Amino acid sequence: MMKRDECLKVLARHRTDEIVVAVYKAAQDWIHIAPSDLNYTFTGAMGQGSSHALGLALGRPDKRVVVLDGDGSLLMNLGSLVTIANAAPKNFMHCVCENGTYETNGAVPIPTHGSFTFTGMAREAGYVNTYTFDNLDDWDRNLDTLLKEDGPILVDLKVEPGEDYPENFPRLYSTEHRDRFRKALAES
């Protein structure tokens, strides 16, 4: 099992010019770990991270799009898996931070957690490849290859909460952040 923030720090070290879509707890962590105008971060639309990332991947096929989803969030929109697989964006990397809870909603346990796999669901939906990591060294060693692999791919990251970064809702929802993202997207 990996600490979520440590897992995201590994991604930040390997990141070049990818668009990163992060939701909920991963978004709160990500804006502190890897600030960038190419971060698309939000909360308040549980389950929609993968759909937003799909739109960006289709709109910018020249740029790699990495979505940092939560397991509870993905469960709120499982239909996105077949939609993503059908669209088949080669530039799409779907990371699921799996901790077995709806963490944002008070760490409510996910019913029947452990009796299904996100990699299995993604494979059945039609994702090109799926991977599972529960060890930081393995994640670090494989990440450069994953960031270049044709997608859509799903990466299940077995995590537990790490450092508790302060919530920064004004940053997530500011018009300044939105405008900087649009400008960075247009200029990249």
Model regions and ranges:
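Feature captures the catalytic ectodomains and active-site-proximal regions of enzymes
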Residues: M1
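Thiamine diphosphate
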Residues: R4-K9, I19, I31-E187
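Extracellular glycan-recognition modules
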Residues: R15-D17
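Short, polar loop motifs at secondary-structure junctions
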Residues: Y24-A27
